[in-house]
Amino acid sequence: MVQCLVVDDDPRILNYIASHLQIEHIDAYTQPSGEAALKLLEKQRVDIAVVDIMMDGMDGFQLCNTLKNDYDIPVIMLTARDALSDKERAFISGTDDYVTKPFEVKELIFRIRAVLRRYNINSNSEMTIGNLTLNQSYLELQVSNKTMTLPNKEFQLLFMLAARPKQIFTREQIIEKIWGYDYEGDERTVDVHIKRLRQRLKKLNATLTIETVRGQGYKVENHV
């Protein structure tokens, strides 16, 4: 089941969203502040976050930036602030979508599901290809009785490739999906992560391999 973090200092909004998420079979974890949300994430993994902007202490912009950079969690901003400058700041902070109050809760749920699809997150956060099972909730790879936990970026990269076998992804596409469009580091970081993933897959004796397509990028092949 999808785990959704909802952060807002208005308890009525928290209860309203949570009740509708539960109807849609989405687990809701509600928190009244950015600080409380980060405390929760020390012990609870979530798949997506819905975040208000105007909160005491850590505001939504700061929280969004932390969720994206430290946890790589998709974020939807939900706020009464509808100025273009606020939207610009939100997207610079890393938000994946922006919804203004008052809002239709069904539209919010549509947007949650759309963002989850972009991140290849499904209801059980698990995918099997060949002899390899990827568990997104625990960032784990499993082949037979062997299990390996990966760093977040490595796992998300492999999950993205494995979700579309044989599809070629360029470095630019990978960076935008995994690190974000505003990433300013060396694009060769993709090559480093691919090299590590290949070593891990070989160690597990996985039937899955990551192939280099010269001049284009990378793709996954399953050898069964």
Swiss-Prot record:
Q: Which residues carry this modification: 4-aspartylphosphate?
A: 52
Gene Ontology terms: biological process: regulation of DNA-templated transcription
Does the keyword section mention Transcription? yes
Query: Which keywords has UniProt assigned to this entry?
Result: Activator, Cytoplasm, DNA-binding, Phosphoprotein, Transcription, Transcription regulation, Two-component regulatory system, Virulence
* Top-level taxon of the source organism: Bacteria
Main localization, broad class = cytoplasm
Among InterPro entries, the record links this protein to:
CheY-like_superfamily (IPR011006), OmpR/PhoB-type_DNA-bd (IPR001867), Sig_transdc_resp-reg_receiver (IPR001789), WalR-like (IPR039420), WH-like_DNA-bd_sf (IPR036388)
Places the protein is found: Cytoplasm
The UniProt function text for this chain reads: Member of the two-component regulatory system HssS/HssR involved in intracellular heme homeostasis and tempering of staphylococcal virulence. Phosphorylated HssR binds to a direct repeat sequence within hrtAB promoter and activates the expression of hrtAB, an efflux pump, in response to extracellular heme, hemin, hemoglobin or blood.
The Response regulatory domain covers which part of the protein? 3-116
Q: Which Gene Ontology MF annotations are present?
A: phosphorelay response regulator activity; transcription cis-regulatory region binding
What protein name does the entry list? Answer: Heme response regulator HssR
Database matches in Gene3D superfamilies: 3.40.50.2300, 6.10.250.690, Winged helix-like DNA-binding domain superfamily/Winged helix DNA-binding domain
Q: In its keyword annotation, does this UniProt entry include Cell wall biogenesis/degradation?
A: no
Which gene is transcribed and translated to give this protein?
Answer: hssR
A GO cellular component annotation here is: cytosol
Organism encoding this protein: Staphylococcus aureus (strain Newman)
Please give the DNA-binding region boundaries: 124-222
What modifications does the entry list under PTM / processing?
Phosphorylated by HssS.
Stored Pfam families: Response_reg, Trans_reg_C
